[in-house]
Amino acid sequence: MSWKKALRIPGGLRAATVTLMLAMLSTPVAEGRDSPEDFVYQFKAMCYFTNGTERVRYVTRYIYNREEYARFDSDVEVYRAVTPLGPPDAEYWNSQKEVLERTRAELDTVCRHNYQLELRTTLQRRVEPTVTISPSRTEALNHHNLLVCSVTDFYPAQIKVRWFRNDQEETTGVVSTPLIRNGDWTFQILVMLEMTPQHGDVYTCHVEHPSLQNPITVEWRAQSESAQSKMLSGIGGFVLGLIFLGLGLIIHHRSQKGLLH
């Protein structure tokens, strides 16, 4: 698995970077440029990790007015020009032994160092998702509908959501939202399935995530209107029974108090 991380550069390296920039801007080549009154100079450093620190790549990019003109890549271990603006600076930095050695060392002092810091917080953080299923509207059997599988409050972002109908995976009619950031280091996603439910159909939302030892599966069963009515009637009867039972207990309690007086 590959992982990319923007750098948290230690104070000493930040100072070295600023010194490098100032040195670059003070070189004869830089002085000879016809720079506009307002310009933007950017320095970006990125670490790329594959299978933890099994393979690490360090890339620094130098950008002038939103155009990258030179870079250092740890795979080649020297500065390279990207545009015609880059050769003078790349050649100058490569000629500075101290600059080149320090940049090469940052593969360990920055990338691997930061990886160990992040390992205890960001990289090992796990939050299990909550999964629910709901139809987009109440419809009778044999009518087109949309089932929505809501997968919420999970971290990290990698997740796999699949739909099954009667234990057979559904691949057509599946629509997903982009991954949504909640703003609290968790994510959510909605995965919809277009379907026409038949009596007895069982739809399953199957979710795989790094926080789970086993996938989460949530089922939704297609029911006829008569079955739904019977279920609602049963629930209604149960609630009414509880109400009458409560009233009976209250009346009995009050009558017992009256006899005692």
From Swiss-Prot:
Changing I235V: In allele DQB1*05:01, allele DQB1*05:02, allele DQB1*05:03, allele DQB1*06:02, allele DQB1*06:03, allele DQB1*06:04, allele DQB1*06:09, allele DQB1*06:12 and allele DQB1*06:36. One of its GO terms (molecular function) is MHC class II receptor activity. Changing Y92N: In allele DQB1*06:16. InterPro entries: Ig-like_dom, Ig-like_dom_sf, Ig-like_fold, Ig/MHC_CS, Ig_C1-set, MHC/Immunoglobulin, MHC_I/II-like_Ag-recog, MHC_II_a/b_N. The keyword Transmembrane applies. Changing E106S: In allele DQB1*03:06, allele DQB1*03:25, allele DQB1*04:01, allele DQB1*04:02, allele DQB1*04:03, allele DQB1*05:01, allele DQB1*05:02, allele DQB1*05:03, allele DQB1*05:04 and allele DQB1*05:05; requires 2 nucleotide substitutions. Changing P87R: In allele DQB1*03:23, allele DQB1*03:25, allele DQB1*04:01, allele DQB1*04:02, allele DQB1*04:03, allele DQB1*05:01, allele DQB1*05:02, allele DQB1*05:03, allele DQB1*05:04, allele DQB1*05:05, allele DQB1*06:01, allele DQB1*06:02, allele DQB1*06:03, allele DQB1*06:04, allele DQB1*06:05, allele DQB1*06:06, allele DQB1*06:07, allele DQB1*06:08, allele DQB1*06:09, allele DQB1*06:10, allele DQB1*06:11, allele DQB1*06:12, allele DQB1*06:13, allele DQB1*06:14, allele DQB1*06:15, allele DQB1*06:16, allele DQB1*06:17, allele DQB1*06:18, allele DQB1*06:19, allele DQB1*06:20, allele DQB1*06:21, allele DQB1*06:22, allele DQB1*06:23, allele DQB1*06:24, allele DQB1*06:25, allele DQB1*06:27, allele DQB1*06:28, allele DQB1*06:30, allele DQB1*06:31, allele DQB1*06:32, allele DQB1*06:33, allele DQB1*06:34, allele DQB1*06:35, allele DQB1*06:36, allele DQB1*06:37, allele DQB1*06:38 and allele DQB1*06:39. Residues 33-126 are annotated as: Beta-1. Changing P28S: In allele DQB1*05:01 and allele DQB1*05:02. Residues 33-230 are extracellular. This is HLA class II histocompatibility antigen, DQ beta 1 chain. CDD domains: IgC1_MHC_II_beta_HLA-DQ_I-A. Keywords: Adaptive immunity, Cell membrane, Disulfide bond, Endoplasmic reticulum, Endosome, Glycoprotein, Golgi apparatus, Immunity, Lysosome, Membrane, MHC II, Signal, Transmembrane, Transmembrane helix. PANTHER family: HLA CLASS II HISTOCOMPATIBILITY ANTIGEN, DQ BETA 1 CHAIN, MHC CLASS II-RELATED. The chain crosses the membrane at residues 231-251. Changing T121G: In allele DQB1*05:01, allele DQB1*05:02, allele DQB1*05:03, allele DQB1*05:05, allele DQB1*06:01, allele DQB1*06:02, allele DQB1*06:03, allele DQB1*06:04, allele DQB1*06:05, allele DQB1*06:07, allele DQB1*06:08, allele DQB1*06:09, allele DQB1*06:10, allele DQB1*06:11, allele DQB1*06:12, allele DQB1*06:13, allele DQB1*06:14, allele DQB1*06:15, allele DQB1*06:16, allele DQB1*06:17, allele DQB1*06:18, allele DQB1*06:19, allele DQB1*06:21, allele DQB1*06:22, allele DQB1*06:23, allele DQB1*06:24, allele DQB1*06:25, allele DQB1*06:27, allele DQB1*06:28, allele DQB1*06:29, allele DQB1*06:30, allele DQB1*06:31, allele DQB1*06:32, allele DQB1*06:33, allele DQB1*06:34, allele DQB1*06:35, allele DQB1*06:36, allele DQB1*06:37, allele DQB1*06:38 and allele DQB1*06:39; requires 2 nucleotide substitutions. Residues 129-217 form the Ig-like C1-type domain. SMART domains: IGc1 (SM00407), MHC_II_beta (SM00921). Changing E118G: In allele DQB1*06:04, allele DQB1*06:05, allele DQB1*06:07, allele DQB1*06:09, allele DQB1*06:12, allele DQB1*06:15, allele DQB1*06:17, allele DQB1*06:21, allele DQB1*06:22, allele DQB1*06:25, allele DQB1*06:34, allele DQB1*06:36, allele DQB1*06:38 and allele DQB1*06:39. It comes from Homo sapiens. Changing R102G: In allele DQB1*03:08, allele DQB1*05:01, allele DQB1*05:02, allele DQB1*05:03, allele DQB1*05:05, allele DQB1*06:02, allele DQB1*06:03, allele DQB1*06:08, allele DQB1*06:10, allele DQB1*06:11, allele DQB1*06:12, allele DQB1*06:13, allele DQB1*06:14, allele DQB1*06:16, allele DQB1*06:17, allele DQB1*06:19, allele DQB1*06:20, allele DQB1*06:21, allele DQB1*06:23, allele DQB1*06:24, allele DQB1*06:28, allele DQB1*06:29, allele DQB1*06:30, allele DQB1*06:31 and allele DQB1*06:33. Belongs to the MHC class II family. Changing Y58L: In allele DQB1*02:01, allele DQB1*02:02, allele DQB1*02:03, allele DQB1*02:04, allele DQB1*02:05, allele DQB1*03:02, allele DQB1*03:03, allele DQB1*03:06, allele DQB1*03:07, allele DQB1*03:08, allele DQB1*03:11, allele DQB1*03:12, allele DQB1*03:15, allele DQB1*03:18, allele DQB1*03:20, allele DQB1*03:23, allele DQB1*03:25, allele DQB1*03:26, allele DQB1*04:03, allele DQB1*06:02, allele DQB1*06:03, allele DQB1*06:04, allele DQB1*06:05, allele DQB1*06:06, allele DQB1*06:07, allele DQB1*06:08, allele DQB1*06:09, allele DQB1*06:10, allele DQB1*06:11, allele DQB1*06:12, allele DQB1*06:13, allele DQB1*06:14, allele DQB1*06:15, allele DQB1*06:16, allele DQB1*06:17, allele DQB1*06:18, allele DQB1*06:19, allele DQB1*06:20, allele DQB1*06:21, allele DQB1*06:22, allele DQB1*06:24, allele DQB1*06:25, allele DQB1*06:27, allele DQB1*06:28, allele DQB1*06:29, allele DQB1*06:30, allele DQB1*06:31, allele DQB1*06:32, allele DQB1*06:33, allele DQB1*06:34, allele DQB1*06:36, allele DQB1*06:37, allele DQB1*06:38 and allele DQB1*06:39; requires 2 nucleotide substitutions. One of its GO terms (cellular component) is Golgi membrane. Changing D167G: In allele DQB1*02:02.
